[in-house]
Amino acid sequence: MPPRKKPKSSALKSNKQSSANHSSQPSTFGIQQLFLRHIQNSQSTSNSHTSTADPVDQQNVNGLASDTAVLTPQNPLGTSNEKPDESKDMDQQLTEASPKISKNLKRFSPGMLIKQSQDDCGGEITWKISPVNERLRAAAKNIPKMMDLTENSLGVKSSTIRPCSLNKLVQKQCPTSGITSKVEQWLSSPSKKASKRPAFATNRVMERVNPSPDAEFEIVNTSSSGNSPFQTPPSLSCPHNKLPCTVTCSGACGSMGAGQHKKALLELLDQVEDVIAVDDKTTDDVGIVMPQARVKDDIISSVVDCAVDEGPVSLPKMQNSINPDSYFLVLEVSEKRGSGSSSKGQCPYKVLRLLDEHTGVECALYLWDEWFYSTVSPGDSINVIGEFDGDGKCDVDRQNNFLIVHPDTLVAGTRVAASFGCPRRTVLDERLRSNEHATVALLGTLQHQVFQAGLSQESPSVDGLQEYASTVIEKSIESLYACGVHEGDVRSTLFKAIPKMLNWIEHFRYSKDSEVSKVDFGSTIGKKAVKVSEVIDIEEMSWAPKYGLKGMIDASVRVIVESDMNTVNEKIMPLEFKSGKAPSGQSSIEHSAQVILYTLLMSERYLKHIDNGLLYYLQSDQTQGISVQRSDLVGLIIRRNELANDILVASTTQQLPPMLRNPNICRNCRHLDVCTIYHKADGGNTESSGLGDVFDTHVSHLSTLHFNFLRHWDRLIDLEGREMQLLRKDIAHPHGSKGSHSASYLSSMVLDVTNGFQHHNSHKETRFIYRFVRQKSSESRERVTSEDMIRTGNLATDDLDCKLRTGDRVILRTEVSHLTVANGIIADISRTHISVSLSKRLRLPWSEPSSEVSNLSHELWRIYKDEFMTSFSVMRFNLMQLFVQNGHNIRKMIVDLEPPRFDNGSILSQDPAISYIWSEKSLNNDQRQAILKILTAKDYALILGMPGTGKTSTMVHAVKALLIRGSSILLASYTNSAVDNLLIKLKAQGIEFLRIGRDEAVHEEVRESCFSAMNMCSVEDIKKKLDQVKVVASTCLGINSPLLVNRRFDVCIIDEAGQIALPVSIGPLLFASTFVLVGDHYQLPPLVQSTEARENGMGISLFRRLSEAHPQAISVLQNQYRMCRGIMELSNALIYGDRLCCGSAEVADATLVLSTSSSTSPWLKKVLEPTRTVVFVNTDMLRAFEARDQNAINNPVEASIIAEIVEELVNNGVDSKDIGIITPYNSQASLIQHAIPTTPVEIHTIDKYQGRDKDCILVSFVRSREKPRSSASSLLGDWHRINVALTRAKKKLIMVGSQRTLSRVPLLMLLLNKVKEQSGILNLLPGDLKP
């Protein structure tokens, strides 16, 4: 196996020694040692455990600083470790394609080491990495001017930080007469240099603080708004005979180690105070005077259990305005006692020290009454809906203002409403995507659609709605099949409901002749006459980051409300439709809560105060008015905050809310299996579950090994999911985003209205197509020539070079107002435009119909890839299926790693499938043996297909052999292109198949085999078709199609399995009794964004896990038909240990055919010489050094060289379609694209080229330095990617780079030596290139 760098120890990285992440063997031995090595190591590595390195291990520190090259099995090439002073530049690189992150000692903060505690209790505390360190520095960058604080303004040292107790609030007795205290001042100690190391997120969400029953508090509820059904914790009142005390905490109380690392966190804030400073000169004329907050000054500040008392100090006057659109970073949390405006006597309250992340201004927030119980910790993000006074203070209590915790976590209104019953169930709903299809839910959805259609029509009729109902049933025929219901029964149910729907529309739609219908809005407002004057939108997508909420509103309506005084008011309201009867009890509360939360969403979306909503129950034909009361909002927002906290705790610590412990409810819960398994994995038992034998039945079949596997992979999924949260934050709250271009979204897009808007009508639905183009560049930029951009490395961003692809789901958001408008699917994308398909017309909430087109075309748009809600929830669902009771077979293979079984006796039998394989002349011996391995497998088989060895052809013949046996087959891969490539070859063989997937994502050659193209009109037709077809194909994440709910297969074949993460691979395997994994784990591994997840094993595919555990299950394809001999020798020497061989003499001797050998340049003539199959163009004599375009790396000289070679190839008769260009960096790919704008050559990064090949491949390595240093940790040291780059060419491989720089990478040094053996190195001179 190719060499890997020797692992380095650090305060952040554990020293992993597990089967998932063991060291590789030297590349010179390569794949021939595969079987022996895994047989020797499988037992020992499978039992190893992860150990965490001591953050101050001196040995590790010395090891990091060492510059000695060590020759070990882990480091066979003697890779030198970098010295700290030499690696600074390398560490600052932000490579776009590399998953590698360089680690060295210089980037560690002193705060990561153990420090002596500052409190009087003695002992030591361990400094954790601060969750706010990086964000503080990011906030500092947004401050217009760096500002200095003098010693006079910062002279008081910060109070000693004390963790508050989870179990009780400690009171301290002090004399009261004549004593008044002021608000405690939080001023930092003398600043130190801020850490330069980016901080990883730590556990920033802790358990909720509950007062101990031992505390002498009187529980009171003095709500002035009346009783609310949404109960919140009561406030606490301090007895008058007890004096107030202060409890200051730097973290949430009661958390594991919170008191220690949160105190260290606060000390770290002191280090960065010189960055976050306030300059009086810059703020004299920008101050804003706000209404005074009701902060009482009769508070005595004291520190619990501490002999040091702090003197009363006042916060400085605010000199900077607080941006109302900013989020606040919580720096410190203190608990005190005092008098609030809504409470009598002394009561506890919290004070949050905040930092405005947009302006860098500090302020204070006071939480009273129910808000006192809010779980807030240093490092959390919050939003405050309210005003701060001139001193930067704000109160949140029963009567005033709101606190939104974790506003970037957008929680669905339906989730908040449902969480009152069981928070644990709601969190599981959020984290797991279930395959369940319920008839009741489906009928409700269909009735929703029919009712919404009636609302949208000007004159709805029974016949019209019945016709629409039939169309809706036809669209949902797959779901009907999954639920097992007949379309005739569903049609009958919908037809019966239509008269009631029309009756409601007739009574409540506004017209001069219609009768007045009154709606009861409750005791506060009473009955009001209501008429709907306009249906503004249906299924309106609404996100409100201000409140941390999102939702899809059934109908947004404009309503005319007539009062008793004959006055008329026009309002906008949400209309929520329920298909059942008006309930009572918990369900009624949930429905009301849902409508109330929708009023918040609409208030934010329409910039209006919306405080009423309508709730219509179809079966009971009852309409309720919902009037929003502050007491309800307080309870719901607190519940939303708790739920957001629960979701974040689950994603950071894998801890769920406690079980409900109610057998009557839990027995019927959809998550009973998952809930009990998680509880057991978290250390729970029968008694703590509260379910008795029911609990034991669901977990007794699992062992400690199983629970360890579950916890490990559950954590890895969450680590990877956290990386996606960064992009989610940009969608939810993009104010701080400065970049104009990102790989996962497009910015500065404008709607192209030159040809109007397109409509795509099918027999099932109408889609609206909107075409977007990049906003025109500025005039000055347009004058810059293409040559100028290439020479300077300065790129235009008009090209749509990103990760978005046809068929991807996307979110449309306005760039200026940051309004999320719609979601859709990419119908088409090119370098110049992107077309998005929507299910309804695109509209802006404030836009009038007459000006709709004009408003849309003048808006700037961002288009985000919507990849957050599906993949990770599917991964967790797949993972949990290994541990349910009926998952025994797949669990023993994947978790227990039991050896697979093979029926070798059948090879000699008269099986017609085996006879076919022996008789098929187009198969070589390797391919034949691989198919025989598949046919004899009882559990699973593994096919290791090296580059160009005909994996796809082998699978085609394997499918034909299995069909001869009468087997049913499920084909799957991670990408749509990989699935379609196989299906195209099956189609050429006349094999019938069913392709599951969206039309937009499927290749046009196989689109006719999609279910949507088959015009299935009945459940019976689906059953017949699925019984008839033997081959079904889907992506791994699309496997949850309703068509597969009741389907089982004999064999599942997964292509490109080496690139698929283990939890993703599990999904298709659940549908089959035997499976086949086809791949090559010596090429690209699964793409993992999180460094921590990758280091802990998430980059290890199921293919690799099983092949390392059981080499006997592998059948190797090593006869390749792609590369000529010279190119193949490179990969053999570096990766495969001479196991690859050419499949024929024609392949081995193939050369690039040129129509003419004439060339104006001698160096180009040498490069194009057909007998030179491998060429390395050395740029060391050209001073062709790398450049930086912001954080991206490119090389303008290499781009020019590539352009000249491509031009010469085309001039000499090589078709541009036979030429491919590969580079490790996106920025270089864009630069080369500008260098050859008129030549249609495929230019991609290495990751995008796996599975593709060309006659001639050019590789631009980019990296070139005047004084090169070791680059072992860079992208170029990733041997998987280098392997892919070298094995894409058929007849000629041309590499361009700096020999001096690349030689510092051990793997590339071997490559260059091998090229030198072939006399393939060509040194360019300064006069060789065109001027």
UniProtKB/Swiss-Prot annotation:
UniProt xrefs under Gene3D superfamilies? 3.90.320.10, P-loop containing nucleotide triphosphate hydrolases
- Swiss-Prot/TrEMBL GO biological process terms: DNA damage response; DNA repair; DNA replication; meristem maintenance
Q: Per its Swiss-Prot or TrEMBL entry, what cofactor is needed?
A: [4Fe-4S] cluster
Q: Which reaction does it catalyse?
A: ATP + H2O = ADP + phosphate + H(+)
Q: Where is this region: Helicase activity?
A: 812-1331
Pfam families (UniProt xref): AAA_11 (PF13086), AAA_12 (PF13087), Dna2 (PF08696)
| Matches recorded under InterPro entries | Dna2/JHS1_DEXXQ-box, DNA2/NAM7-like, DNA2/NAM7-like_C, DNA2/NAM7_AAA_11, DNA_replication_fac_Dna2_N, P-loop_NTPase, PDDEXK-like_dom_sf, SF1_C_Upf1
- The UniProt annotation places [4Fe-4S] cluster binding at C422, C666, C669, C675
Q: Which residues form the UvrD-like helicase ATP-binding domain?
A: 924-1271
**In which residues does the motif Nuclear localization signal occur?**
2-8
Q: Name one GO cellular component term.
A: nucleus
Family, according to the entry, reads as follows: Belongs to the DNA2/NAM7 helicase family.
UniProt function note: Essential protein required during embryogenesis. Key enzyme involved in DNA replication and damage repair, shoot apical meristem (SAM) maintenance, and development. Involved in Okazaki fragments processing. Possesses different enzymatic activities, such as single-stranded DNA (ssDNA)-dependent ATPase, 5'-3' helicase and endonuclease activities.
| Protein name listed in UniProt | DNA replication ATP-dependent helicase/nuclease JHS1
Species of origin reads Arabidopsis thaliana (Mouse-ear cress)
Phylogenetic lineage: Eukaryota, Viridiplantae, Streptophyta, Embryophyta, Tracheophyta
Give the gene name: JHS1
